[in-house]
Amino acid sequence: IVYGTVTTPGKYPWMVSIHERVKDVMKQACGGAILNENWIVTAAHCFDQPIILKDYEVYVGIVSWLHKNAPTVQKFQLSKIIIHDKYVKDGFANDIALIKTATPIDIKGSKYGVNGICFPSGATDPSGEATVIGWGMIRGGGPISAELRQVTLPLVPWQKCKQIYGHPDSEFEYIQVVPSMLCAGGNGKDACQFDSGGPLFQYDKKGVATLIGTVANGADCAYAHYPGMYMKVSAFRSWMDKVMT
């Protein structure tokens, strides 16, 4: 997260860290959001093909890697990794995946402050501002963060986002902005490498966090004037429901 601030324990109980085996060491790879006691939503590009389940694990209830043995922290193995069937490797569209934990996540009145995130109730496109969180790089090519960070970004209407990326002078003309994407930022604040798959969310009138997007592949981090790319969760609800039933 670029230009973010450090979060406090328990503020985002549905946030997870996905670790991937790199040369026999498990390392921070992506973020994700807990949907229910079995399923987590994240990005498709987080996973190398062919998928080897034992090369990934998920941490819940964690805020800082300096305290990864804290009593709130739980680690889960995975039983399924389901990539969206229309996702193409290194592509930008349909960059969404669902992962299932091998054992259920205790979210019902969990003393560990672990919970699922809600979906927004309305069908209208989100507008205004939204927040993204993660343990990713704090600047392009920079170090990753030991602490979970948060940043609030302006949402950019997709037509405008499409114009920015598709402009003849754009350095990222190859990125096709489609209606199933959300764009946010462009003001120097952004998600970055290793934040992928993490949640973009807003708060409803009751103050409940609602998931509107997941961090997707995009331009370089915090690239001046270019908004960050997210998958629009509402566009994938029927796919998600089908996978989870």
UniProtKB/Swiss-Prot annotation:
Subcellular localization, as worded in the UniProt entry: Secreted
GO cellular component terms, semicolon-separated: extracellular region
One Pfam family hit: Trypsin
Domain (Peptidase S1) ranges: 1-245
PROSITE patterns xrefs: TRYPSIN_DOM, TRYPSIN_HIS
SMART domains linked: Tryp_SPc
SS bonds (residue pairs): C30-C46, C161-C183, C192-C221
Gene3D superfamilies: Trypsin-like serine proteases
The enzyme's E.C. designation: 3.4.21.-
Main location (coarse class): secreted
TM region(s), chain numbering: none
Expression tissues: Expressed by the venom gland.
Record: active site: H45, D95, S196
Molecular functions (GO terms): serine-type endopeptidase activity
CDD domains, per database record: Tryp_SPc
Entry similarity comment: Belongs to the peptidase S1 family.
Function: Protease. Hydrolyzes gelatin and succinyl casein.
Name recorded for this polypeptide: U21-ctenitoxin-Pn1a
Species the sequence originates in: Phoneutria nigriventer
